[in-house]
């Protein structure tokens, strides 16, 4: 397997994202209040109890679905395994999807009663970058597969 710049642009940010997800999402899946104390989750007084339930749902889903897929996909891709490419594509699809959902929710909730998110800027800076990386990663894996079929 050729380990060009694209390979590393998938692997390195992927591992950084995985470690961040374990810290920012897996821990709050067990204790949302711990996530609030760590600064990785928003408190109910800023986003309402419904907002907390929404963000907790993402944390729990990340714990049981996204984190395992991303970890297995990164390992399998690193090893050059076909199953790794399939699994990393599943994780990259989620990587593209969830930032879009979160940004849509932040926009839709702006004028909702009880929604007092102090600063949206981090959402609008980081989440589009994550979504773009996910979309790029899908394209890159497709390119890898096409090149593999030619050799």
What does each model-found stretch correspond to?
Residues 1-151:
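Topology signature of small-to-medium multi-pass alpha-helical membrane proteins
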């Amino acid at each position: 397997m050729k380990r060009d710049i694209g390979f590393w642009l998938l692997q390195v940010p992927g591992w950084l994202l995985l470690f961040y997800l374990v810290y920012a999402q897996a821990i709050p899946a067990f204790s949302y209040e711990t996530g609030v104390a760590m600064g990785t989750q928003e408190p109910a007084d800023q986003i309402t109890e419904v907002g907390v339930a929404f963000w907790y749902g993402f944390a729990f889903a990340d714990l049981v679905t996204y984190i395992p897929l991303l970890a297995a996909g990164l390992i399998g891709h690193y090893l050059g395994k076909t199953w790794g490419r399939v699994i990393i594509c599943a994780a990259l699809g989620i990587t593209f999807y969830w930032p879009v959902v979160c940004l849509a929710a932040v926009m839709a909730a702006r004028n909702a009663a009880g929604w007092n998110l102090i600063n949206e800027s981090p959402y609008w800076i980081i989440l589009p970058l994550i979504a773009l990386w996910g979309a790029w990663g899908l394209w890159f894996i497709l390119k890898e597969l096409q090149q593999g079929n030619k050799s």
